[in-house]
Amino acid sequence: MFKEYKIYKFFEQVKQETYKVVWPTRKELVASTLVVVVAVFIFSPICLVLDYSIHNIMQLLLNIGK
């Protein structure tokens, strides 16, 4: 019985806390989303080039002894 009460109380507190959350406006949400999308498009090619370069360097080093 006590365990069920604790679970119930926990979810009641969670519900109360959701009312205190300051949710972003639509404008803020769109702006944040655009920042993330632009960052992904900027950093993806950089990661691709770095990965390809490291791969080629490792292949070169591993094939030296052959």
Curated annotation (Swiss-Prot):
Compartments where found: Cell inner membrane
Keywords from the named record: Cell inner membrane, Cell membrane, Membrane, Protein transport, Translocation, Transmembrane, Transmembrane helix, Transport
GO annotation, cellular component aspect: plasma membrane
Domain of life: Bacteria
InterPro entries the UniProt entry points to: SecE_bac, SecE_sf, Translocase_SecE/Sec61-g
The keyword Membrane belongs to this UniProt entry's keyword annotation: yes
Membrane topology: Single-pass membrane protein
GO biological process: intracellular protein transmembrane transport; protein secretion; protein targeting; protein transport by the Sec complex
Matching Gene3D superfamilies: Preprotein translocase secy subunit
Disulphides: none
HAMAP family per UniProt: SecE
Family named by the database record: Belongs to the SecE/SEC61-gamma family.
Name of protein: Protein translocase subunit SecE
Originating species: Rickettsia montanensis
